């Protein structure tokens, strides 16, 4: 049986009684009129004023600009931590009330007074129930242990002096401490660089004496890495997306088999060579066939791939599915786009996943578009995707980097936050009219791996099963720790089951929709 602390069919009363703060004219007007003026189910977002923050810096910050989403004070409201590059990072504490306009205050603690930050990933590194932050830097990375009140304390960590641009973590079978990997970009110490001077990557596994490093080489300038149980056999492997701009000819995408001694999958395993200007990784079972598609952002076409068979063989399908997003869809700049962070989520709650892609020129690369709007690809009934970024109001022309689709005000709709290079951070509230039903599922475990990283959630609405893996990593230089959101169309009840990390599936249970459900492993 499930234990269900925090089972909630109604909004948290304490949250609903908090002071709302000033109601912005833009959001208030849209909230008042959206139900009358909008076409049903057409996505709509309204801009939200937030404290000023810019990701800036020279060539070492052309990449990066990650965004971490975490509840750092235990009030169930997602807070934001954005990398700053040459500026300090910022922590935006969420002060929104349920179903009301989104509000944030700058609550950056002294521990985030850091330089040269490229990204941030939340996870509970020390198993104390408070979310921590892995801060990636051009230089030594920093692990910050959360105190449960949005303040942090530096933790002992020495991962060397690298240009860090990607992170992922998991808990391997039989381990009480996390395994984590850090992806590195160009080796700044190589006098022959930067081209063909990609650094190696690092895998850190727990031992009785602490974490021990395994160097993963060759490195091909990783910009996104992700531990994922792609084969659904209970063992997460490590996927890496690499930037052809610097590896040029000898590199490729990589998938490491996490055996006792890690090894790269090869053609003998069914792995095919893929080369692209890899920026971000996102995975999701879009067609409900029990296998996750892999979506890779890049310069030019964004690479959606479908798994073939049970092995690590993938077929490119971006044009067949309408997900290539290879050029700007508004404006008169016809040069190729540059994609960064990809976030999946059902923004209309109609039961079909959508995809947001943060777009923007690296800096001033003349072969690529400068006027390069973000994409919001809406999932259609036939399995294809259609562009709605301009209709939805999120087609920003800034040079975007990290991003997140997450419910910021507890109303069951996924909102959007985006970090921009040399332009202010942007947040949009989802004000879509007549959305479908939804379910939010938060998993916790006692004593170790408190966020249940590696668990699978399946939700059956009677038509198809949505499957979701709890992971840390992917994206571009940032990620989300928190509940898993499911859009469910018209369903009023669904069946739910969990496969806890390294465990068996629970029995199916029927639960009502339109609620935040918290489940703790017995």
What do these predicted regions represent?
Residues 46-58, 109-111, 267-272, 317-333, ...:
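Surface-exposed loop and turn segments in beta-propeller and other repeat-based domains
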Residues 49-87:
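Beta-strand-rich domains and repeat architectures in extracellular enzymes and scaffolds
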Residues 77-84, 131-137, 178-185, 237-242, ...:
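Hydrophobic beta-strand segments that make up the repeating blades of beta-propeller
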Residues 38-45, 88-107, 140-155, 192-212, ...:
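Beta-propeller blade repeat segments, especially FG-GAP/WD-type strand-to-loop junctions
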Residues 151-153, 159-258, 262-282:
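Solenoidal tandem-repeat scaffolds enriched in leucines and small polar residues
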Residues 58-62, 110-114, 157-161, 215-220, ...:
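Surface loop/turn motifs at the tips and blade-to-blade linkers of beta-strand repeat domains
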Residues 64-72, 93, 117-127, 131, ...:
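Beta-propeller blade termini
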Residues 37-38, 42, 46-57, 152-154, ...:
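Gly/Ser/Thr/Pro-enriched helix-cap/hinge segments flanking short amphipathic alpha-helices
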């Amino acid at each position: 049986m499930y234990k269900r602390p925090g089972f909630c069919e109604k909004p948290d009363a304490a949250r609903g009684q908090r002071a709302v703060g000033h109601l912005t004219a833009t959001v208030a007007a849209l909230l008042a009129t959206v139900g009358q003026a909008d076409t049903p189910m057409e996505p709509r977002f309204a801009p939200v004023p937030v404290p000023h923050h810019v990701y800036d810096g020279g060539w070492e910050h052309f990449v990066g600009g990650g965004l971490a989403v975490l509840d750092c004070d235990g009030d169930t409201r997602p807070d934001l931590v954005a990398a700053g590059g040459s500026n300090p990072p910022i922590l935006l504490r969420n002060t929104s009330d349920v179903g009301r306009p989104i509000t944030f205050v700058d609550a950056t603690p002294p521990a985030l007074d850091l330089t040269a930050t490229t990204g941030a990933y939340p996870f509970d590194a020390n198993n104390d129930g408070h979310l921590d932050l892995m801060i990636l830097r051009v230089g030594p990375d920093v692990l910050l242990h959360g105190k449960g009140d949005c303040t942090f304390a530096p933790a002992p960590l020495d991962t060397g002096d690298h240009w860090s641009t990607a992170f992922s973590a998991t808990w391997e079978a039989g381990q009480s401490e996390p395994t984590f990997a850090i992806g590195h970009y160009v080796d700044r110490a190589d006098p022959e660089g930067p081209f063909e001077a990609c650094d190696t990557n690092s895998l850190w596994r727990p031992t009785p004496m602490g974490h021990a490093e395994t160097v993963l080489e060759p490195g091909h300038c990783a910009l996104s890495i992700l531990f994922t149980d792609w084969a659904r056999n209970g063992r997460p492997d490590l996927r890496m997306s690499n930037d052809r701009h610097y590896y040029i000819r000898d590199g490729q995408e990589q998938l490491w088999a996490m055996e006792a001694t890690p090894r790269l999958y090869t053609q003998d395993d069914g792995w095919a060579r893929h080369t692209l200007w890899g920026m971000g990784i996102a995975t999701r079972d879009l067609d409900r066939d029990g296998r996750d598609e892999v979506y890779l952002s890049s310069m030019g076409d964004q690479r959606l791939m479908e798994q073939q068979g049970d092995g690590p063989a993938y077929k490119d399908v971006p044009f067949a599915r309408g997900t290539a997003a290879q050029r700007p869809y508004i404006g008169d700049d016809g040069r190729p786009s540059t994609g960064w962070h990809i976030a999946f989520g059902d923004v209309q709650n109609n039961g079909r996943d959508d995809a947001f892609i943060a777009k923007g020129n690296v800096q001033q690369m003349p072969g690529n578009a400068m006027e390069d709007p973000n994409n919001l690809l809406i999932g259609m009934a036939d399995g294809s995707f259609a562009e709605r970024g301009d209709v939805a109001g999120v087609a920003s022309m800034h040079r975007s980097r990290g991003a997140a689709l997450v419910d910021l005000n507890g109303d069951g709709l996924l909102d959007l936050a985006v970090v921009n290079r040399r332009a202010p951070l942007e947040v949009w509230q989802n004000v879509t009219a007549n959305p479908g039903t939804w379910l939010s599922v938060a998993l916790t475990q006692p004593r170790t791996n408190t966020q249940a990283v590696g668990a699978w959630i399946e939700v059956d609405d009677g038509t198809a099963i949505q499957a979701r893996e709890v992971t840390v990593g992917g994206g571009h230089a940032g990620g989300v720790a928190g509940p898993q959101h499911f859009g469910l169309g018209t369903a009023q009840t669904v069946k739910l089951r969990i496969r806890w990390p390294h465990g068996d599936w629970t029995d199916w249970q029927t639960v009502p929709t339109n609620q935040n459900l918290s489940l703790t492993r017995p």
